[in-house]
Regions:
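Phosphoinositide system proteins, centered on phosphoinositide phosphatases
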Residues: 1-460, 489-563
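A phosphate-binding catalytic loop at a beta-strand-loop-alpha-helix junction
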Residues: 465-484
Length: 563
């Protein structure tokens, strides 16, 4: 049984009493109706009449309810408004832009949205307008991506374990299903939960109206290495949990979610004529003259890294000074939260190499010490593991069932004083870190899958470990190190495929190296803007391989802007 995929085309019929959504390419599919002003959902098998406005959209982002408290009438009188009359808006994607293909699946970027009110407001509420403005700004500025046929929220390795007969939204990783909360009304209605009226039971026809959206960075580029055609892909998925901005969100919450958690997946796709970015980067040889790797099998090689704040209770309190006040609660109080966090990380990724890049001196030393203390506390305590949530991708257990080691023995703490090692613009010394991680990188491996002619993926190898990198912000130092690990793994993958010979490196191909550096620097900027409001620091090193004084001056400007 084939899965129900989201509609690629939706028409909206708007009237004073409802919004009706239908797909012109699927005339036999039921129409989704959202009644106004109640917000009740229903499916209609017939044609609705009376719509005053008909428009075409790319998809439904979700339904959001903003609470109204005190409002102002037309005469200026202040008046209380009950929750029953709270404003709700249907958020729709009015414009999207194709930005590349992966294995034949078109990927889109959200360009513009519209907030369609369920209630015509007679009162003006300044708080409501403020919340609405904030939300519109977030959606407008945030890079969001989606596909009608490809799951962007899951790594290739997790996709290989998914049930392809499930609707796209049910396969999505809950952490990276960015619009999951605003889709709650649609999902509840689909699952048969009442929507303001007696439930009619599960409504599988709603599946086609639920479109998972990912927030983060996406780059797909057709390129080559030493004349061998490939598609280079870099995806960073930002977690929807604890997704606040820099000084407003640090550390972990009670559920074990950490600030600025991102999963970055670097992919190489070989022998896939259906994959193509909108731009190619083939160097002097040109795209048309590149030679395919021997064999016709479409191969996917993937390598996943993560980043996230140190999982204890800590904060930086704004005191109007450039350096805010650092506060860290007792480590014992964070044990439950940290264990929840690492339980999930171990289940999902296997061995965790906890790469800590904060300074060993000064104010950052307290964060370093806290991380080391919480890790030691977990490894020395009796294990009380938290049960996996089968509704999320925690069902993907990387650890073998017969592994007899202690649960938290899968955590491997690695410290590298990044600033001290690279001071004086000696950034080449960051390569010393590879010596500390090499054994773990080799043992953890990467994902390698080959498409079967009958469909599905023949998994040749799995990635069984992840490097979880952090600095204070999990931005600038983290970006430099992650790109370095990505390059090292890419070289290993291409050697294993026979594209490179032992002793050669991907960076020996200058055209590809230029592409690689710029894609990773773009990734750094996207992650940084989402968390700090500015582009990343130290990207001159990522883009060129050298730390420059001009880059240092640009970093100073960005630091002032962040403050």
């Amino acid at each position: 049984m084939s899965a129900t995929l989201p509609f690629r085309d939706i028409n909206v019929h708007a009237s004073s009493t409802y919004y009706a959504f239908s797909s012109p390419s699927s005339p036999n599919a039921p129409t989704l109706v959202i009644d106004r002003p109640s917000g009740d959902l229903r499916l209609n098998d017939g044609k609705l009449t009376g719509g005053h406005r008909v428009s075409s959209i790319s998809g439904i982002l979700g339904i959001v309810k903003l609470r109204l408290g005190m409002a102002y009438a037309a005469d200026g009188a202040r008046k209380a408004v009950t929750d029953e009359l709270s404003d709700s808006y249907v958020i729709v994607i009015t414009k999207s832009q194709p930005m590349g293909r992966m294995k034949g699946h078109q990927i889109y970027k959200v360009i513009s949205t519209e907030f369609m009110p369920l209630r015509e407001r007679q009162l003006t509420d300044p708080d409501e307008q403020t919340y609405l403005t904030y939300l519109k700004t977030l959606i407008k500025s945030g890079p969001m991506y989606f596909s009608y046929s490809f799951d962007l929220t899951n790594s290739y390795q997790r996709q290989a374990q998914c049930d392809p007969s499930q609707p796209l939204w049910q396969r999505a990783d809950d952490r990276f299903f960015w619009n999951r909360f605003v889709c709650s009304s649609l999902i509840d209605f689909r699952e048969g939960q009442a929507s303001g009226r007696m439930s009619a039971g599960p409504q599988p026809a709603v599946d086609a109206y639920i479109l998972p959206v990912m927030f983060g960075m996406m780059n797909i580029t057709s390129t080559s290495v030493k004349g061998n055609a490939l598609t280079f892909v870099l995806i960073t998925r930002r977690s929807r949990h604890r997704a606040g901005t820099r000084y407003m969100s640090r550390g972990a919450d009670e559920q074990g979610h950490v600030s600025n958690f991102n999963e970055t997946e670097q992919m190489v796709i070989m022998n896939d004529s259906a994959s193509a970015g909108l731009t190619s980067f083939a160097g002097d040889q040109g795209f048309a003259n590149r030679n395919p790797v021997d064999g016709k099998e479409t191969q996917v090689l993937s390598y996943v890294q993560t980043r996230g704040s140190v999982p204890v209770f800590w904060a930086e309190v704004n005191n109007l000074h450039y350096v805010p006040t650092l506060q860290i609660r007792g480590i014992d109080s964070a044990k439950e939260a940290a264990s929840r966090h690492f339980d999930e990380q171990i289940r999902l990724y296997g061995e965790n190499y906890l790469l800590n890049l904060v300074n060993q001196k000064g104010r950052e030393k307290r964060v370093k010490d806290a991380y080391e203390e919480i890790t030691s506390l977990l490894q020395s305590s009796p294990v009380e593991r938290h049960e996996a949530d089968n509704k999320t991708n925690e069902r993907f257990n990387v650890i073998e069932p017969n592994d007899k080691r202690g649960w938290y023995d899968h955590l491997h703490y690695v410290y590298f004083d990044f600033h001290n090692e690279t001071k004086g613009l000696k950034w080449h010394r960051a390569q010393l870190l590879l010596d500390q991680l090499k054994d773990g990188l080799v043992a953890g491996g990467y994902f390698h899958g080959i498409d079967k002619p009958s469909g599905g993926v023949d998994v040749r190898r799995k990635q069984t470990a992840v490097v979880r990198t952090n600095c204070m912000d999990c931005l600038d130092r983290t970006n430099v190190v992650q790109s370095m690990l990505g390059r090292w793994t890419l070289t290993r993958q291409l050697i294993d495929l026979g594209v490179l010979k032992p002793g050669e490196s991907a960076q020996d191909d200058q055209s590809f190296e230029h592409l690689f550096r710029n894609v990773w620097a773009d990734n750094a900027d996207v992650v940084s803007r989402s968390y700090s409001g500015t582009g990343a620091l130290k990207t001159d090193f990522t883009r060129t391989g050298n730390r420059t004084r001009a880059g240092a001056l640009q970093d100073l400007n960005s630091s002032i802007t962040r403050y």
